[in-house]
Amino acid sequence: TMFNVETRISEKCIGCYPRVEGSDPESGGLPMETRCMAACIGQVRMQGTVKLNEDGTWAEDRYNPLYYMIHVAKVALPLYPQFGTEPNGYYIPPRWVPRAYLRQMFGPGVDAAVEKYMYPDRELLAVLQLFRRSNRIIYRYELKEGPKVYEGTLRGKPFEMYNDTVIAYGADGKEMFRTEIEEPLFVRPDIHQNSI
C-alpha cells in the first residue's frame, strides 16, 4: 500500500490492470507492463504472463522469456521458496551478496543460478537483452545466431560471445523489436565538450 498525502488515505496497488489487460489508451490493445516495471531505471525487471495447465501448473512454453529463465536456464528463483507465497515473483540472485545469505533467501539452487548468470551461455545472454527494451509484455522470443565477436576468459573461465539477434514478439504474435548482443559504439565529435 501507499500513503496518499493529499487524501490522507492509504491506497492499495491495483497492479495497473488496465495496462496489463491491454485497455490502457497507450497500449493499442496489447498488454503492457505495470508502471513500476516500466519506470525501473536499472533495467532489471521483466513482467509477463505464462500459460497454465488445467491443474494450475505451468505449461511448457520454451520460448517465453519467463519460462526460459525459470524452468530452462534456472537463473530466476523464487524469493523464500519455503513460504510458497503468491503471486509468483522470481529474481535473478545478485552475485555480490554472500552465498550463505543467498542460500537462506533463495534455497539450494542459488549457487548454480549465480554461476549460470556469471557465465551466461549464448541463449541466456540473448534473453537478458530483452529486459526493459519495451514497456509491452513479451510473449515469445526468437534467437538468430550471429558471428563470434569475442573469445577469451571471464573470471578465469573460457568465454565466447556471439553477436546474436534476439527478436521479441507480443500477444498478437507480431514482432515488437529486435536487438543485438553487441551494443554499438558511438564516438562524439570534438565539437562537444564531453567528447573523448
Task: Outline where the language-model segments fall.
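Ferredoxin-like iron-sulfur electron-transfer modules
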Residues: 1-34, 38, 50-53, 57
